Every structure is written in structure tokens, then in C-alpha cells.
A protein has these predicted regions:
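Active-site core of glycosidic bond-cleaving carbohydrate-active enzymes
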Residues: 1-211
Length: 211
């Protein structure tokens, strides 16, 4: 849906359709699962609200939606591990991509943590727009804490990239495009490391392609 919204903004700017879809995808409270049971989709939903506001400046919609955003984030936070990170749990579908090769979905996936961090940053923005400053401070603390953990947890000097996942605190040797691409998009790494990723991952044809 988030990709469709971006095409909509570019071709039609039909914000009403985007709003209705965001509402429908969110569903009703209480939250009992991730959106479509897919953890990635929950984070994309938060990011779609961020995009919507950036394209439209529609504070009223964000204020109306904020209680549903908060309850969904409470669901996510209630399922974090001892590191404050997310992992697939019973009933979750960790999708990532329809990759042609093997894609490990176990443990702490760097890709999911990057999306989770950006979702928390989205909550900071939306809480402020909704006038919920205490919430905003709480989300800011959580996002800052998670962001500081990303490099120590997933950066590999050997690979010159973020590794795909960690299991039991141990880095895998697998490197995929997903986390590295989003970390560059969101400026989560230094310029030096972004350039390393460009060569070691983004321009490297041996890395599993995105489908």
C-alpha cells in the first residue's frame, strides 16, 4: 500500500483515497495482530502516515488517527525483546521480500529494526502534532536508544555493511540489501559507511537482489 500511495501522490494526489486506505488497513482496537499479520506491514503503515503528512501537511487527519497509532505501537512495544528489538513471534509473518534465494527470518533482523526505529521517529512527530508531548518524549527516548544500538549490533567491518540478522546476540555472516538500503535512505549511518555500503552492497551484483 505504501508504494501505491507514493504513486498516487505523484499521479493523482488523491489524498482522500489514501486516508481511507490508511484507516481501513489499521482496523479496530483492540490490536490482536500485526497488520495482515505481517510485522513489516505494521511498520510500513506507520511510515505511510509519515509520508502522508509530509505530502499533504494534513494535521487534522494525523490528530484523528493518533489514538490508533498509539495503540498499535503499544502492541509492538509489548512484543519487544530484552534488547528493545523486535523478532517474529508466534502468529507473526516476517515477510521482508519474495527473494529468489534463502532469506533467514529468525532472530533480530536488521531490516526490521531499521523500520521499527523509523516508526518510533514517526510516532514522535505525530505525538507532537497531536499535542501529546509526554508521549513524544517517550517515543523519542525509545527511538534514540534503538538507533544507537543498530551499528554495534549489526555493522560488520569485514563485510563493510550491516549484516542481515543476529541470533542469540551473534551476528550472521549474511548480508542483504534491505537494512543497508533503508539505513542509507534514513541517514542512520555516517557518510563514510554509506559510501562503503554503496560499494559492498548496493552496487554489488553478488548480493541477493530485491524482487
Amino acid at each position: 500500500a505504501i508504494q501505491n500511495y507514493l504513486m498516487n501522490y505523484y499521479l493523482f494526489f488523491d489524498s482522500e483515497t489514501v486516508k481511507r486506505t490508511i484507516w481501513q488497513l489499521r482496523g479496530k482496537d483492540p490490536v490482536t495482530s500485526h497488520i495482515n499479520t505481517i510485522m513489516d506491514y505494521t511498520f510500513y503503515w506507520f511510515l505511510s502516515v509519515y509520508d502522508y503528512y509530509m505530502y499533504t501537511g494534513d494535521e487534522k487527519f494525523v490528530k484523528q488517527l493518533y489514538p490508533r497509532m498509539k495503540s498499535l505501537m503499544e502492541y509492538v512495544l509489548g512484543r519487544t525483546d530484552s534488547d528493545g528489538m523486535v523478532q517474529g513471534m508466534t502468529g507473526d509473518w516476517v515477510f521482508v521480500d519474495w527473494a529468489d534465494g534463502y532469506l533467514d527470518k529468525k532472530g533480530q533482523l536488521a531490516f526490521e529494526q531499521v523500520l521499527f526505529c523509523k516508526s518510533l521517529e514517526t510516532m514522535v512527530l505525530c505525538a507532537r502534532l497531536a499535542g501529546e508531548m509526554q508521549d513524544a518524549r517517550g517515543y523519542e527516548k525509545l527511538s534514540s536508544s534503538l538507533r544507537k544500538k543498530l551499528e554495534p549490533a549489526f555493522w560488520s567491518e569485514d563485510a563493510k555493511a550491516l549484516v542481515h540478522n543476529r541470533i542469540g546476540g551473534k551476528q550472521s555472516t549474511s548480508v542483504t540489501r534491505y537494512a543497508n538500503m533503508f539505513a542509507v535512505f534514513y541517514d542512520y549511518l555516517s557518510e563514510e559507511k554509506q559510501q562503503l555500503i554503496k560499494q559492498s552492497v548496493l552496487l554489488n551484483d553478488s548480493i541477493l537482489k530485491i524482487t
